[in-house]
């Protein structure tokens, strides 16, 4: 045998099993075995699969690498650490490749970014929204909500994006802007507080809601015509495509005590909503059909709850978020686990439970294309749950670590058959993680990892944002490794993809930094109502000769760049 540096299997003839009829003459059988005649479907004469891509030729040209899945994560620092006031993010929203981030600052509290196909982050513009601090935001899809649905007197011809911002005083602003040319403008303002007097009971003074304690908790698009907003315990639905005289009046308003979050069924029935809260039964979830009444699942049988001790049962159940994963399945967070319900089932029991055994789960996101459910908790862990085998699953555990092992003597037989290890940690958190607040210095009181915002990009990548304005982009890549060295093959003709060691940020060139727009139609108010927009993209940036600024560090600040400014018109019709 010729010596090579690649493995060569032993040349052994393997004859497939065949049925041979019994013959009386043994001599004929011996003669047939000694001849060179072979069965018609053996490897010697069956060449139907020789060109199949599944088979790989064991030679020097092909047997030099192997392909596996790896996690690729890129991080950007959206706000600098040298600022006198620390920027605390309040929400994040993504539509297609446009990313919107909001902070609790009085100025520059909205930033628009673009995630390119090369996984580069481009800052488009900075907007200052007047009023109280922003608590939640929502990018409305351009296809379903074009700005042209409003009169031409309220919008600019260049506007192509609508934004919803919820504030601490119960106000939701509808902003129209151009992603590349700026000129942001508030075209509608929805005051939720003036509709609460009819829904608040006068016999219970504690339910009296004042503008100081009425923050907008969540806003979400609804039925391609309007949006749903949550203020304290009240659920609002507005129709943006209705008559202009009735657009500021909600088409639905109801109070649900103890509600924490909601999710609209965006698959086939937008009139069906899932509600989670502290007063929706022991499981903390309810279904709201806008055409019928409220339904609360039955009490969960404690005997089937695996891994629940007495201390765990005595804790108050907390459900903070929910998400629809199909037209008939909804997932909700309950303390440190996830419950998946089938709304067609009548037994009052979840079809599957996912045990992360980390912190309290605070956010859920689902990727319909890959069938992956993402969860984030108060300890900073982000876990990806593979739900492709949901029909056969009863319990889900982590793939790695000691938390992936669970023993139950009473129901050990049941667990071994219906437990799937389907959870992978995407972002690892720590309960006592030290945070560098300035330069490389660490303060003793700067501990904890805070809240993680989750959202899905257009290509299925996961986007995370922590409370220190660190943006992360995570994706699963097919990576080729060299068999001999075990290193990643680069993309210079020898491999298809690889994990990059640096993140890139594209900004405008030096000539764009000194440009300032000063037109006559600008409008600004004094005090806290100074509304401005900094557009960092000029027409020169769209040219092909525009070079990107490449940073070698994985995290960096973009506040060093002097941005050009333009003032927003804050008049509301």
From Swiss-Prot:
Repeat region (WD), residues: 144-185, 315-351, 356-395, 397-448
GO molecular function: G-protein beta/gamma-subunit complex binding
Sequence ranges of Low complexity compositional bias: 500-509
Keywords annotated in UniProt: Cell cycle, Cell division, Cell wall biogenesis/degradation, Isopeptide bond, Repeat, Ubl conjugation, WD repeat
Coiled coil: none
Segments crossing the lipid bilayer: none
Record cross-link Glycyl lysine isopeptide (Lys-Gly) (interchain with G-Cter in ubiquitin), residues: 553
GO cellular component, one term: cellular bud neck
Keyword NADP: no
Biological processes annotated in GO: cell wall organization; invasive growth in response to glucose limitation; regulation of pheromone-dependent signal transduction involved in conjugation with cellular fusion; septum digestion after cytokinesis
Cystine connections: none
Induction comment from the UniProt entry of this chain: Expressed periodically during cell division. Requires ACE2, CBK1, MOB2 and SWI5. Expression is also increased under microgravity conditions.
Similarity comment: family membership: Belongs to the WD repeat DSE1 family.
Extra information: Present with 3080 molecules/cell in log phase SD medium.
Protein name in UniProt: Protein DSE1
Lineage: Eukaryota, Fungi, Dikarya, Ascomycota, Saccharomycotina
Chain's gene name: DSE1
